[in-house]
From Swiss-Prot:
The keyword Kinase does not apply. Keywords: ATP-binding, Biotin biosynthesis, Cytoplasm, Ligase, Magnesium, Metal-binding, Nucleotide-binding. The lineage of its organism: Bacteria, Pseudomonadati, Campylobacterota, Epsilonproteobacteria, Campylobacterales. This is ATP-dependent dethiobiotin synthetase BioD. It catalyses: (7R,8S)-7,8-diammoniononanoate + CO2 + ATP = (4R,5S)-dethiobiotin + ADP + phosphate + 3 H(+). The gene is bioD.
């Protein structure tokens, strides 16, 4: 079993969108795909991200047909905030997240793990999302936006991953400012990262590499 952790430069950048596209691309190649959303905040009645992930996964993996959203999440909280802030009772246990991860790993040959927020989002007081990635020992797909200011956020995220020797790939989700991207961002990416790719082009090729 292999796994891939989908993270981003921040919140509302497109982790769920990218995870769903990758799920479809992998399933189209005959892979048995699973999904895991360790922590979701801003949950009142049902976890929106986990729900849509599970609905899509059920269509391509029978092992997930009988599961509920709480089966593919470890913790949910009503407050839309970083896990440490949303967890007002401080009940998050990393070993519970790892246990869920290993349980779901038995149901697929590749598990897509969607993070919350960005790499330095606090899960507990001294444990961050990037630390969870290290614990899981998984490869990473970093999702970045194309809007003005994203170069700085992208480079900082890359530096964080490199400093911890975490292998990663990255893609651009051109959902914002797609028209201005060619002027305000693309020139730098073309000069420094000529092999960059977006979620609209290159997802199938990336899926073949997993």
């Amino acid at each position: 079993m292999s796994s891939l952790f989908i993270t981003a430069t921040g919140t509302n950048v497109g982790k769920t969108h990218t995870t769903l596209k990758l799920l479809d691309a992998l399933a189209a190649k005959g892979r048995s795909v699973g999904v895991f959303k360790p922590i979701e905040t801003g949950v009142l009645d049902s976890a929106p991200d986990a729900t849509i992930l599970l609905e899509s996964c059920r269509k391509v993996n029978r092992n997930f047909e009988g599961l509920k959203t709480e089966d593919i999440t470890a913790y949910t909280f009503p407050l839309p905030a970083a896990p440490f802030c949303a967890d007002t009772n401080h009940k998050i246990r990393i070993d519970r997240i790892l246990e869920k991860y290993h349980q779901l790993s038995q149901l697929c040959d590749i598990l897509l793990v969607e993070g919350a927020g960005g790499l330095m989002v606090p899960v507990t007081r001294d444990f961050f999302m990037i630390d969870l990635i290290k614990e899981l020992q998984t490869r990473v797909l970093l999702v970045t936006p194309g809007r003005l200011g994203c170069i700085n956020d992208t480079l900082l995220s890359m530096e964080a991953l490199k400093s911890r020797n975490i292998a990663f790939d990255w893609c651009i989700n051109l959902y914002e400012d797609a028209e201005s991207f060619t002027e305000v961002t693309q020139p730098f990416y073309d000069a420094v990262f000529p092999a960059w790719w977006s979620d609209k082009e290159g997802m199938e090729k990336f899926a073949r590499s997993l």
